[in-house]
Amino acid sequence: MYSMEQVVNLAKHRGFVFPGSEIYGGLANTWDYGPLGIELKNNVKKAWWKKFIQESPYNVGLDAAILMNPKTWIASGHVGNFNDPMIDCKKCKARHRADKLIEDALDAKGIEMVVDGLTFDQMADLMKEHEVKCPDCSSEEFTEIRQFNLMFKTFQGVTESSTNEIFLRPETAQGIFVNFKNVQRSMRKKLPFGIGQIGKSFRNEITPGNFTFRTREFEQMELEFFCKPGEDLEWFAFWRETCKNWLLSLGMTEESMRLRDHGEEELSHYSNATTDIEFKFPFGWGELWGVASRTDFDLKRHMEHSNEDFNYIDPQTNERYVPYCIEPSLGADRVTLAFLCDAYEEEQLENDSRTVLRFHPALAPYKAAILPLSKKLSEGATEVFAELAKDFMVDFDETGSIGKRYRRQDEIGTPFCITYDFDSVEDKAVTVRDRDTMEQVRMPISELKGFLEKKIQF
């Protein structure tokens, strides 16, 4: 089994992810996506948009503003209730999220337990019972558990006063809810229908960590799917299965994921069903996707605070009701990291070894690499590159032996290496090498585009 350290080292060495502000000593838990990382992440986002917006007869897209009227967050409950349980170590002054500290301590003992949803007293009792220690200094002396609001606060305009106070959004969902009527009317949508968007969110996490898994600045891919009350659990099951199948269609293995239903004590007060799709990272199981039936909570809250009517009139029955909502919420950074971890392999060959990223071709940063066998063949190889680059991200590499170039492309997940050799000048054909099998076939240059188009389908 590979370690998280191996994945992080490859990510930096090969230009997937760099530490943020590195030349100034960095900024804790900030990361910059490098040339290959942004291609991978963009491909993940494109694949999500294709499945959940483009190919869906129900759903449309939106791009709501990051900065919203502060009343939005009062209505949604974020100002009063968007908190994590915080605790400080009395000895080393390290600050921790109490529920995660307890879960990690229990996990080390082989005890699986969800602490989220317990009272502070119950958490404190668990800490004493299991002698939970500070991971930084091993002390068992902690302050009392207290609430910590996760929203980033800033000011709009030239003066810093409470009247100009605004927040960086902690989720993209509220931008969808406040635009429910705008979208429904302008697009003439009838229930059921959904609104999806991809965008940045910000949470002042107490203990971010595990590379890009938990960061204070992150990107979400969220769908809010509105339906008639009473049909919500049917749609909940539909979207839960659709989400799982999307991951499988892009090469994630069944063994590396699990669906975990929330028990009654863990459910949010507004939810009647929630399932987390979790991935087995090298550091343990972590949530990728939360699929929740949110009932009519959000639309009703915004109705109360804005005096806007979000009732829907059914054109067939003339019934009037506030729609229920199913929310599949996916972290773009988390699922990108999951695909990177799932693809990573160190393979032992007969007389050699190689590191390979077995990405689905749809996700791979480069779909192919053009490799002239000799620099004397660069002109012809460049023509092949130029033609394919109109439709695909392709690499061009003429440095080093062909074997070393193959290994470099394996390590960044390029599914196909296209070698332009001396015969190519005459027969207008190239050798195509498959990353996973390492098998090679001869193919006319004229067929390359169709070949790659077929391979990147999912």
Swiss-Prot record:
It holds the Pfam family tRNA-synt_2b. The keyword Ligase applies. GO terms for cellular component: cytoplasm. Signal peptide: none annotated. InterPro entries: aa-tRNA-synt_IIb, aa-tRNA-synth_II, aa-tRNA-synth_II/BPL/LPL, Anticodon-bd, Anticodon-bd_dom_sf, Gly-tRNA_synthase/POLG2, Gly_tRNA_ligase_bac, GlyRS-like_core. It catalyses: tRNA(Gly) + glycine + ATP = glycyl-tRNA(Gly) + AMP + diphosphate. Its EC number is 6.1.1.14. It comes from the Bacteria. ATP binds at residues 203-205, 213-218, 287-288, 331-334. The keyword Chaperone does not apply. Keywords: Aminoacyl-tRNA synthetase, ATP-binding, Cytoplasm, Ligase, Nucleotide-binding, Protein biosynthesis. It is an enzyme of class 6 (ligase). One of its GO terms (biological process) is glycyl-tRNA aminoacylation. Its main location: cytoplasm. Belongs to the class-II aminoacyl-tRNA synthetase family. Catalyzes the attachment of glycine to tRNA(Gly). This is Glycine--tRNA ligase. It comes from Bacillus thuringiensis subsp. konkukian (strain 97-27).
